[in-house]
From Swiss-Prot:
Primary gene name: NDUFB8
Keyword flag Transcription regulation: no
Compartment list: Mitochondrion inner membrane
Keywords: Disease variant, Electron transport, Membrane, Mitochondrion, Mitochondrion inner membrane, Primary mitochondrial disease, Respiratory chain, Transit peptide, Transmembrane, Transmembrane helix, Transport
Topology term for the membrane: Single-pass membrane protein
Molecular functions (GO terms): NADH dehydrogenase (ubiquinone) activity
GO cellular component entries: mitochondrial inner membrane; mitochondrial matrix; mitochondrion; respiratory chain complex I
Disease linkage: Mitochondrial complex I deficiency, nuclear type 32: A form of mitochondrial complex I deficiency, the most common biochemical signature of mitochondrial disorders, a group of highly heterogeneous conditions characterized by defective oxidative phosphorylation, which collectively affects 1 in 5-10000 live births. Clinical disorders have variable severity, ranging from lethal neonatal disease to adult-onset neurodegenerative disorders.
Pfam families attached to this UniProt entry: NDUF_B8
Protein name listed in UniProt: NADH dehydrogenase [ubiquinone] 1 beta subcomplex subunit 8, mitochondrial
Length: 186
């Protein structure tokens, strides 16, 4: 009993001590720094200019997300375009994401990167794609109906068996020689 009590006290002491110790540097290095978090929503033109400078944007191009309580702060509202639409032949600093150093990333970059959604315009309009899909489905349903109404079977000849048409297996007399069955003519 005393050993169990000592073990519980040891665990409690270890938990209290670990709260007071600073975390390891490698663990905290993966978190965002204070400068990376968006600041408060800009209310004045000076705050907008400072936020635009913070995100390496021109003041004319800077438009923050609306202050609706979602926590976007002063982060710029970038166009909802995927990375597929960016020039693949440009010499990007990070070619995998097609981003340059210091360029603001889209708030939903995990959704608009090249492995996910492609928002580039399609070469065929939505109406034409729907017409092609439903036209193909209607044609296939029609052909299945035609095949059901007018079945087609392969021509079949009479069944042929080995060993003189299975003479003994069908109850033939073993002492009698059966007539020879010829399945072909030459």
């Amino acid at each position: 009993m005393a050993v169990a009590r000592a073990g519980v006290l040891g665990v409690q002491w270890l938990q209290r001590a670990s709260r007071n110790v600073m975390p390891l540097g490698a663990r905290t290095a993966s978190h965002m720094t204070k400068d990376m978090f968006p600041g408060p929503y800009p209310r004045t033109p000076e705050e907008r200019a400072a936020a635009a400078k913070k995100y390496n944007m021109r003041v004319e191009d800077y438009e923050p997300y609306p202050d609706d309580g979602m926590g976007y702060g002063d982060y710029p509202k970038l166009p909802d375009r995927s990375q597929h639409e960016r020039d693949p032949w440009y010499s990007w600093d990070q070619p995998g994401l097609r981003l340059n150093w210091g360029e603001p990333m889209h708030w939903h970059l995990d959704m608009y990167n090249r492995n996910r959604v492609d928002t580039s315009p399609t070469p065929v309009s939505w109406h034409v794609m729907c017409m092609q899909l439903f036209g193909f489905l209607a044609f296939m349903i029609f052909m299945c109906w035609v095949g059901d109404v007018y079945p087609v079977y392969q021509p079949v000849g009479p069944k042929q068996y080995p060993y003189n048409n299975l003479y003994l297996e069908r109850g033939g007399d073993p002492s009698k020689e059966p007539e020879r069955v010829v399945h072909y003519e030459i």
